[in-house]
Every structure is written in C-alpha cells, then in structure tokens.
C-alpha cells in the first residue's frame, strides 16, 4: 500500500484544477500545467482536494499511485508558488550573464558557452557568480539547472565549477610525494 498516494492534495486558493479524459490540468498565477494520469488509476476532485483511486493489492498500481500523487502535488505547487534552483560559479574568471532567453557563461573554456533557456523557465543572474532558475514545472527547472551545472561540474581538488548553492563538494587531498 502506498502511503504517499493515500494523502489527499489540498488545492490552494487561486488554483483551478480540471480533469478530462485522464488529463489533469492546473491553472494558477504562474501559468498552466497538465499531466496525463496512467489509465489504471483514477483521480477524484472533491471540494478543495484531489485524491488518487487505485487498487491497493496491485504492486504496479501502488508504485504508480505514489508517483502520480507526488507529480500532481508538484504541479499544483508550481502553478501557485513556482520552483527555483540556485547555482553558484566558483573559480577565477567564471561569470554568468543572462540576456533575454540566452545565458552566456564564461567557464574557463576558449569560448563563452551560450545556453538557450527553454520556454516556461526564467533564468536570472543577481550577480556575476550566481544563477537563479525559476519556473512552474519542477522537473523542467531541475533539468535546466542540471544542464547548466553539467557545463563545468565541480572538481574535487579545488572545488572549481558550477555548483548548486546548497551543494557540499567533498574535497580530495592533493597527491603527496
């Protein structure tokens, strides 16, 4: 039995949820998100809560129900509050600059790295070494942050590179003679 799927999702004020043909759509101040629910599951909208219907004896439905509930909850939080990931650049000469929907990164390569920001995501640079990725879809925000980090992942000896703001880099000791 999935413990996550048993919890109903409360819908905050300002968020409108509709269910049609296995597609759940949430509309709020941060935009519109929709997600297809697996055919073997059911979704009920009662009052201000959303709940998942599933067969508790079926192992596949148990797994799908918990995941679907988490995805729907993230969708509702995304259209009401949004999600953000903060990244920081550590290294001499490493800097970032956002120009419209293009993020320009100087990461020690012979050329600047130009990253095209996908629709639905906003990238801000409060300072030259800080990047903030914001959006309504949690999965897309996390993927964009991971793509930016992948250009120059932090190395373990000096810790230089692009890292998440809350990330701790485990450092290695230099080779001894």
UniProtKB/Swiss-Prot annotation:
GO function terms (MF aspect) = rRNA binding; structural constituent of ribosome
Pfam families named in the record: Ribosomal_L6
What does the entry give for GO biological process?
A: cytoplasmic translation
| InterPro entries assigned to the protein according to its UniProt record, in alphabetical order | Ribosomal_uL6-like (IPR000702), Ribosomal_uL6-like_a/b-dom_sf (IPR036789), Ribosomal_uL6_a/b-dom (IPR020040), Ribosomal_uL6_bac-type (IPR019906), Ribosomal_uL6_CS (IPR002358)
Domain of life of the native organism: Bacteria
Query: Any idea which UniProt keywords this protein has?
Result: Ribonucleoprotein, Ribosomal protein, RNA-binding, rRNA-binding
Residue ranges annotated as coiled coil are none
Q: Name one GO cellular component term.
A: cytosolic large ribosomal subunit
The answer to whether the entry has keyword Phosphoprotein is no
Quaternary structure and partners: Part of the 50S ribosomal subunit.
| Protein role | This protein binds to the 23S rRNA, and is important in its secondary structure. It is located near the subunit interface in the base of the L7/L12 stalk, and near the tRNA binding site of the peptidyltransferase center.
Q: Which family does it belong to?
A: Belongs to the universal ribosomal protein uL6 family.
HAMAP family with a match to the protein in the record: Ribosomal_uL6_B
Supply the name of the protein.
Answer: Large ribosomal subunit protein uL6
